[in-house]
């Protein structure tokens, strides 16, 4: 196509490369094209501004011209030679985009822009480490094509946005990790000459609810959203910041042309779908999406939609499809009436976190604040569903004007719910609290509320005093109670009861038995100490022998004999015992212990030498 076929009022192409690596590309609004520019290593910031200083009549003429809407990118670049080209940079900037990369959807519906407003439509691509290649970026920016489905035409990413946000224009953020795109099966086959990124989203036509639009002019919709996404703590807070935006008037050039509006708005794809391969997704992820429709249920009405599950060929759940409905269709237009514009609806998304097996956050579902969204969006006649590939990050304020969206959020790993465990006092989980712990921490009493812990503590204190006043030991009390009550009332039980190192139920069981026995022992003590000993019983007949202590001289003699012979005979042991004036059994045991000590020491040295 020659350059003279272009409209005379085309705006010049301005390429500005700033210090931050951003480029500003301007092109006419009626040319439905996308200019993509990227570096070798990183994605630079692209700002595509639409020069709206066009008359409505000129826009209508260019919209009716079939050749004007289907012109290629090379023709646009040649047309810019007539106008001034401004480059503010110390380095050269080269734009290399082949003709097949840019896909144009022919539209017979004219789009007239109000000449009174200057509308800029920037697309900011945030740079991230090791980002997309030139071919991948061009493919992502030009659109998506469904494999073997009714979407037989390439779809342009809709870029038209009303007005400016905060004086900088509405932002449509595209941030994608680079390295993972090449690892996905079916996505690496894009030819360098300009193949499209083909994402097989079959059955997306079921997600649209289309209504015919009257040929007269629609009321202008004014909307802006400036969500503040600063930190992870603020993800659960939603807020709406509304401002006045420029009005865009859309009309049909021919009354016979049926223009459709998409009520469910566009399609927002979570970028985690791109990095699904690196996070453990199955290779059949893409093929499963092709063979299995994403949306299986009929959508006669937007309200009442439920989430859908996306599974691979093995039946494993790899993603969910939460369909976000407009609250205005359920609870009325009360929220929308508070906004300055009539055609606005408010959508609230509750944030959810997706964690991998290592506990790292890999994606968020619906982490955007409350958004003021236009209720209708125009759709090109040949495009069934407009697709918008976006990603919202928490690095800064990002504004996105989009209708109610369908979010595809794959789940490479199981979502781990975060639970908080509260420990009552110093009581560890899985352990029964003792009486002492419960008395010191009254708030920890649960099932023991019916037990008077203070009474048990006072009784344990008095029981010890009364036992000592009778001259009885814990062993004597335990022996007497074991003979009459059973082994549960041994000396160790008496010791733990006096120290309150016992559970409330056990203490409640011991208390009446100890109280009855102590009262009876005091009665026997009044009759005489001898009667008390008869009642209690003598000390256990089996006593532990007194530990033998060797003098340093005896130890030296024993070590000397041990160095000569570590295993003496019985006669030698008897002679050594007579010499040292010790019992023969004591000397024999010493030699046994000394040999065992040497054996254990030798084992330790062997391990240390290794």
Curated annotation (Swiss-Prot):
Tissue and organ distribution: Ubiquitously expressed during embryogenesis.
Residue ranges of DNA binding: 543-602
Annotated coiled-coil segments of the chain: none
Compartment list: Nucleus
Keyword tags: DNA-binding, Homeobox, Nucleus, Transcription, Transcription regulation
Single GO BP term: regulation of transcription by RNA polymerase II
Top-level taxon of origin: Eukaryota
SMART domains the record matches: HOX (SM00389), POU (SM00352)
Cellular component GO terms held in the UniProt record: nucleus
PROSITE patterns linked: HOMEOBOX_2, POU_1, POU_2, POU_3
GO molecular-function terms, A-Z: DNA-binding transcription factor activity, RNA polymerase II-specific; RNA polymerase II cis-regulatory region sequence-specific DNA binding
UniProt-listed SUPFAM superfamilies: Homeodomain-like, lambda repressor-like DNA-binding domains
Region Disordered: start-end pairs: 55-87
Domain (POU-specific): residue spans on this chain: 448-522
Main function: Transcription factor that binds with high affinity to the motif 5'-TAATGARAT-3'.
Record family assignment: Belongs to the POU transcription factor family. Class-6 subfamily.
Protein name: POU domain, class 6, transcription factor 1
UniProt source species: Danio rerio (Zebrafish)
Gene name tied to this protein: pou6f1
């Amino acid at each position: 196509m020659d350059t003279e076929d272009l409209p005379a009022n085309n705006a010049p192409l301005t390429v500005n490369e700033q210090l931050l690596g951003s480029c500003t590309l301007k092109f006419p609004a009626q040319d439905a094209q996308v200019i993509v520019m990227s570096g070798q290593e990183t994605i630079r910031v692209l700002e595509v501004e639409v020069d709206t200083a066009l008359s409505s009549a000129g826009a209508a003429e260019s919209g009716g011209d079939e050749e004007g809407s289907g012109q290629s990118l090379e023709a646009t670049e040649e047309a810019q030679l007539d106008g001034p080209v401004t480059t503010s940079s110390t380095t050269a900037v080269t734009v290399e985009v082949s003709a097949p990369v840019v896909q144009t959807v022919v539209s017979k519906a004219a789009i007239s822009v109000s000449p009174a407003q200057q509308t800029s439509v920037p697309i900011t691509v945030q740079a991230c480490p090791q980002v997309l290649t030139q071919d991948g970026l061009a493919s992502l920016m030009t659109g998506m094509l469904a494999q073997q489905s009714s979407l037989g035409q390439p779809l342009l990413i809709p870029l038209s946005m009303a007005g400016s946000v905060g004086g900088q224009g509405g932002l449509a953020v595209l941030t994608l990790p680079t390295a993972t795109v090449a690892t996905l099966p079916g996505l690496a086959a894009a030819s360098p000459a300009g193949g499209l990124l083909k994402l097989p989203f079959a059955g997306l036509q079921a997600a649209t609810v289309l209504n015919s639009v009257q040929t007269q002019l629609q009321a202008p919709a004014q909307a802006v959203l400036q969500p503040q996404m600063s930190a992870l703590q603020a993800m659960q807070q939603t807020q709406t910041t509304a401002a006045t935006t420029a009005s865009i008037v859309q009309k049909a050039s021919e009354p016979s042309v049926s223009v459709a509006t998409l009520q469910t708005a566009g399609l927002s794809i979570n970028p985690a779908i791109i990095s699904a391969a690196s996070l453990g997704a199955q290779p059949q992820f893409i093929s499963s999406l092709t063979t299995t429709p994403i949306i299986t249920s009929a959508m006669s009405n937007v309200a009442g939609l439920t989430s859908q599950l996306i599974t691979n060929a093995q039946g494993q759940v790899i993603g969910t499809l939460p369909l976000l409905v407009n609250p205005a269709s359920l609870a009325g237009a009360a929220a929308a009436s508070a906004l300055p514009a009539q055609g606005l609806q408010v959508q609230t998304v509750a944030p959810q976190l997706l964690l991998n097996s290592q506990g790292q956050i890999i994606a968020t579902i619906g982490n955007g604040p409350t958004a003021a969204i236009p209720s209708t969006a125009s759709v090109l006649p040949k495009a069934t569903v407009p697709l918008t590939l976006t990603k919202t990050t928490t690095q800064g304020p990002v504004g996105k004007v989009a209708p109610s969206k369908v979010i595809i959020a794959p789940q490479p790993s199981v979502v781990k719910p975060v639970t908080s465990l509260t420990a009552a006092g110093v009581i560890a989980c899985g352990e029964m609290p003792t009486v002492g712990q419960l008395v010191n921490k009254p708030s920890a009493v649960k099932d023991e509320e019916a037990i008077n812990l203070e009474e048990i503590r006072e009784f344990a204190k008095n029981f010890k005093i009364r036992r000592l006043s009778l001259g009885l030991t814990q062993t004597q009390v335990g022996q007497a109670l074991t003979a009459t009550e059973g082994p549960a009332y041994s000396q160790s039980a008496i010791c733990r009861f006096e120290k309150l190192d016992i559970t409330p139920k056990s203490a409640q069981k011991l208390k009446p038995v100890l109280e009855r026995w102590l009262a009876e022992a005091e009665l026997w003590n009044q009759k005489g100490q001898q009667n008390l000993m008869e009642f209690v019983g003598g000390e256990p007949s089996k006593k532990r022998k007194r530990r033998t202590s060797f003098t340093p001289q005896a130890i030296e003699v024993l070590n000397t004999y041990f160095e000569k012979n570590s295993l003496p005979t019985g006669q030698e042991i008897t002679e050594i015992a007579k010499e040292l004036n010790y019992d023969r059994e004591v000397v024999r045991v010493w030699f046994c212990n000394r040999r065992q000590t040497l054996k254990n020491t030798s084992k330790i040295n062997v391990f240390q030498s290794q």
